């Protein structure tokens, strides 16, 4: 039985190999970003529906997340190609260059993706540009602080050990939890502050 399972896994890997080569890699990266962003939102919505009686699952919200995720896929695909050309490095011997890559990724790509996320979803949900910018100003630093807590270590592993054509797939594999957090942050509405001492 175990031998049959191993053969099946090898066949599945061989069948999937073309998805990570040539033009198919761009499509794989694009759809992977969209699917996982929608899945993260779906996980968050399931929690919200259970926690808040009366709230319903919004397929439109998850579709918007899918669209924004797909729009980020090509950026990430070409970003990692460019970054690998700018700072070619992999393995422990090139740790100083890898650290530079992590720093460039955190200081350039992360803020761009944060802005993209909030403005893109705002646009798809009918917000005006001013409303989206207000939301971005209110939530960006929470996003960026969390980003610094999660992604430098993940990117260190990515740039040290993951082959370049699997970089976006690796990140996509880690993003389910991150995308669930992003969905929480996007749809979180702060409770109104109570004035202390004057309760009726």
UniProtKB/Swiss-Prot annotation:
Transmembrane segments: 24-40, 63-83, 102-122
Keyword tags: Membrane, Mitochondrion, Mitochondrion inner membrane, Transmembrane, Transmembrane helix
One of the GO BP terms on file: positive regulation of mitochondrial translation
GO molecular function, one term: mitochondrial large ribosomal subunit binding
Cellular localization per UniProt: Membrane; Mitochondrion inner membrane
GO CC terms in record: mitochondrial inner membrane; mitochondrion
InterPro entries in the cross-refs: Mpv17_PMP22 (IPR007248)
Highest taxon listed in the record's lineage: Eukaryota
A Pfam family reported for this protein in Swiss-Prot or TrEMBL: Mpv17_PMP22
Record's bilayer topology term: Multi-pass membrane protein
Quaternary structure annotation from Swiss-Prot or TrEMBL: Interacts with the large mitochondrial ribosomal subunit.
Role noted for this protein: Required for the assembly and stability of the mitochondrial ribosome. Is a positive regulator of mitochondrial protein synthesis.
Similarity comment: Belongs to the peroxisomal membrane protein PXMP2/4 family.
Protein name, entry field: Mpv17-like protein 2
Organism whose genome encodes this protein: Mus musculus (Mouse)
């Amino acid at each position: 039985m175990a031998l049959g399972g191993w053969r099946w896994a090898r066949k599945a890997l061989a069948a999937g190999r073309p998805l990570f080569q040539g033009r198919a890699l761009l499509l794989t990266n694009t759809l992977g970003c969209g699917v996982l962003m929608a899945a993260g939102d779906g996980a968050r919505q399931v929690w919200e529906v259970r926690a808040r009686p009366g709230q319903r699952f919004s397929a439109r919200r998850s579709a918007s997340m899918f669209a924004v995720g797909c729009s980020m896929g090509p950026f990430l695909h070409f970003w990692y190609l460019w970054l690998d050309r700018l700072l070619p490095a992999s393995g422990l011997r090139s740790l100083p260059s890898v650290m530079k890559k992590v720093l460039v990724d955190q200081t350039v790509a992360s803020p761009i993706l944060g802005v993209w996320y909030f403005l893109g979803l705002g646009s798809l949900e009918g917000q005006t540009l001013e409303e989206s910018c207000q939301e971005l100003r209110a939530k960006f630093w929470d996003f960026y602080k969390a980003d610094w807590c999660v992604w430098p270590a993940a990117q260190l592993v990515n740039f040290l050990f993951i082959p370049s054509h699997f970089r976006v797939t690796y990140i996509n594999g880690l993003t389910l939890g991150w995308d669930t957090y992003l969905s929480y942050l996007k749809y979180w509405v702060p409770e109104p502050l109570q004035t202390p001492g004057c309760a009726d």
